[in-house]
Amino acid sequence: MINQFKTLNPINLLLLFAYTFFMRIAILANPPERLNFEFLEPYTKLLIQIPIGNDFSTISNILLAGILIFIQALIFNRIVNNHALLLKPGFLPALLYITTASLFEPFLVLSPTLICNFLLIMIMDKLLKIGKSPNAIMIMFDVGIFIALGTLIYFPFVVMLLLIWLSLLLYRSFNWREWVSGLIGFLSIIFFLAIFYYWNDNLGMFYKIWLPLKNKFPSNFKIQYNDYLVLVPVAVMMVLAMIQLRENFFRSFISTRKAFQMLFFMFLIAILSFYTKPAFKLYHFLLCVPPGAVLLAYYFSNATKRWFYESLFLILVVAIQVFLFV
């Protein structure tokens, strides 16, 4: 299966579409009785009313989520190929994106993080361009706007602001205009939210929106390890990818090295930002899918022992299906 997607064969588009819904067989066969979809944060709903959410039936929710994942996978695949992050262009990034976006049941339904991943993929594309641009001011401004829009949908997305400055450290010499432009882009959207609260004599509530940033990082975690055994093959692939990346690190183009360092920071921020959400939900980690899928695609793109990597991928797919059905 991996070999099939190493090429840009158009038939792979149909195979990817079928594969997207194959990975949803378990939840389609036994759908939950009710699914709640909160598209915006409560502080945004006061400003913007979008008449969607609980109007979807369970099946419609699952099918629409699958279509969105498929669209994201194609956009993601184009970006990875355009920036030459793998040995050769193909559909491996899309395949791994769909696979990792199917790991857990909360990933298979509509969620704020699913919508935010459109923004995260666009941010990834913008940040991969800054090393090739003579001036990154407008790129950083756009990234700031994307992060602000994501924050209106899902508050932990605000922590992605750190990624702006980490990326500038990686790619460019210090230019205070570039460092400030991302923040200005972010504040240009948040400014309208502040004006709304001001008009309603409610600036105190606007201040409270940002209080979760002061939350202490939890020291104790209650984890049902049986629920996360599906991550074992993913962890093995990640380790193999890191080994592969280390072996090729100094033989790669400088832009490729910096790209994977930036993606590592994105992955880390996506994981750690959960602390800003008091009512933590597993779908938060859907934000880890774009950077994680690049790393997995890198491993399969460079792997040489076909019997091994095909077996490893098959084990992952079977494990996902088993744990979704159980």
Give names to the regions the model predicted:
Residues 40-56, 207-228, 241-245:
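Juxtamembrane membrane-water interface segments that cap and precede transmembrane helices
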Residues 160-184:
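Perimembrane helix-loop-helix junctions
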Residues 123-138:
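Membrane-interface transmembrane helices that cradle and orient dolichyl/undecaprenyl
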Residues 15, 176-196:
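Hydrophobic alpha-helical membrane-interfacial segments at the cytosolic entry of transmembrane helices
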Residues 246-304:
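Membrane-water interface signatures at transmembrane helix termini and the short loops
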Residues 90-105, 114-121, 143:
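Membrane-embedded helix bundles of polyisoprenyl
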Residues 139-155, 271:
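Membrane-interface alpha helices of multi-pass inner-membrane proteins
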Residues 67-83:
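Transmembrane-helix motifs of polytopic, lipid-linked glycan transferases
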